[in-house]
Amino acid sequence: MTLNKKTNNENSSKTTPKLSKKTDFQNDFASKNYVFNPQDKVFQIAQVFGITSAVLIKKLLQLGLKADVNQTLEKDIVELLAKEYNIKVIEPQKEQTPPQLQPQKPPLTKSKLQAKPNQKLNLQKTPPIVTIMGHVDHGKTTLLDAIRKTRVVDQEFGGITQHIGAYQVEYQGNKITFIDTPGHEAFDKMRARGAKITDICILVVAVDDCVKPQTLEALKHAQKAQIPIIVALNKVDKPNNKTQQIMQELSSYDLLPEEWGGTTPYIAISALKREGLEKILEIILLFSEIQNLQTNPDQKAKGTVIEASLDKSLGPVATFIISDGNLKVGDIVVAGTSYGKIRSMEDENKKTPTKALPSQPVRVSGLKEVPQAGDIFYAVSNEKQARQIVSEKKTKTKETLAKPPSPLNLEDILQDLETEKPQELNIILKADTQGSLEALQGMIDKIKVSDLKVQLLRAAVGTITEKDIAFAKSSDSLLIGFNIKPAFSTLKSAQIQEVKITIHNVIYRIIEDIEQKLKSMIKPTFEEVVTGKVEVRKIFNISKVGNIAGCYVTQGIVNNSDFAKVMRNDEVLFKGKITSLKHLKDNIKSAKQGHECGILLDGFNDFEINDIIETSKLSKVEE
């Protein structure tokens, strides 16, 4: 590859090529001209353009072309791409033999993943916290089970394992914390509350399937949190392997594989056969070392609530993950708008430590109320201080809710209705057998009601548990059971926490319930309907109230609940809400054509004689 450089004098009046906003680096040798070489590969052309291979592959996908970093491109395609970066593609001179650029695989360095320096004293190495995410049936739980080397699914109903939403494993003398959060919604709620809850994300994709919407949703949340991502290509032991297709698609979302010149590790695994797990654990430790995760274990505890529920024996219980400091039995903590004295702590093995260190998950009791998943908790000096903090938080919440709404504008309301995001119905599904579960999943995937979406956050065999209720509460999900009988205590807990459980023994009844729920979520469509028109004939100034327009109704009917548009010489001066409609001194509901009335508007006083006020309302459009 040869670049035809020009001297500074020749280029002084010309601008340099415009580069993509997503460029990770700019090569010093990127110039106005590029000498085309048919042997140049995608990653080499990207270097010339001053962009990453991932950006160039994404551009090619937008053109409908699939390529990897080692693929060559036709000249017309290169010319099309070069135009965007103000680069001219020229033919090489016959006597020239363009030298080839050597592949430059970007190493995984601290510059990519460097954590902010911690200025606290007595900093010590902290175990990484890892979240496993992905589509509901691509093997997240199986991978967690395999890493933990216990059958969590089998022991959920009466075994010795204590489900606290997170657990630790040890590998090569290093501890790693895994969060057992089977849905990205709860993860996103934690991030939305300001919790840096996880250090690394494992994105699980089944190679016998493909990239699903829930896969991309999970990816989006991980990228928002700005954490390293490891792609686990699961079920490699099965036929119909679509690894290349998956890598190609995820590359367009800035997950360029290391073997293609990117920085994202793609690990082939079989969670069921426990193959490839050591490689994942090695990369987790590598990412942890690069991020230089450190905290001060000697200070007061701070961390995040992972799960919370109401236990019939212990009262409010919550799973804490400590992000800084240490938590001890007897500490006073504030968690969201709850507080209390830690009475007991348990880990996932039902051991009862008296102290929990950074990245350690523990299930605690002693809080006055059930906090929410994602709430920040921290230890305070005494109960009086905790009460004061919680009281102030609750007061601020009430003040926020009590704030008067801003002046209404009909066009703004219509725009809000039009741009409102499609609603989603979150579902947690439990069934008696794997066959029933798969049949229900297939039927639920086919449900279509308007533009509403069904998100199946969890699907598993077995009865409904306290863990399901806690997850349904935190993710605002509908909990559905097929051919199962939950324990009375579980149903009672769901009632206390206001979690709706639906149990059926006939599959189509479940589908009907879901469709009915979706139909109830459909928001009506509205349109603006003009109700009347008035002419301003007098202006009355009322102290402490403002100007009232004395009007004559020339068309239709004016109602006291209408919106108003003030016009002068065909120019719209104001759009807003009618505050008051009067006849003489009396408040009236409406004024008909040929009648007089007084109009007071919310936010407008500058009336002039002969102004026109057009009134309108929102009318529901029948489907």
Swiss-Prot record:
Alphabetical list of PROSITE patterns matching this protein: G_TR_2
Record region (G1): 134-141
Region (G2): 159-163
Record's compositionally biased regions (Low complexity): 1-18
Keywords tagged on the record: Cytoplasm, GTP-binding, Initiation factor, Nucleotide-binding, Protein biosynthesis
Function in brief: One of the essential components for the initiation of protein synthesis. Protects formylmethionyl-tRNA from spontaneous hydrolysis and promotes its binding to the 30S ribosomal subunits. Also involved in the hydrolysis of GTP during the formation of the 70S ribosomal complex.
SUPFAM superfamilies (UniProt xref): Initiation factor IF2/eIF5b, domain 3, P-loop containing nucleoside triphosphate hydrolases, Translation proteins
Protein name: Translation initiation factor IF-2
Annotated tr-type G domain residues: 125-293
Annotated spans, G3: 180-183
Ranges where the record places region Disordered: 1-21, 92-115
Organism of provenance: Aster yellows witches'-broom phytoplasma (strain AYWB)
Coiled-coil stretches noted in the UniProt entry, renumbered to this chain: none
GO MF annotations in UniProt: GTP binding; GTPase activity; translation initiation factor activity
Entry keyword Protein biosynthesis: yes
Domain of life: Bacteria
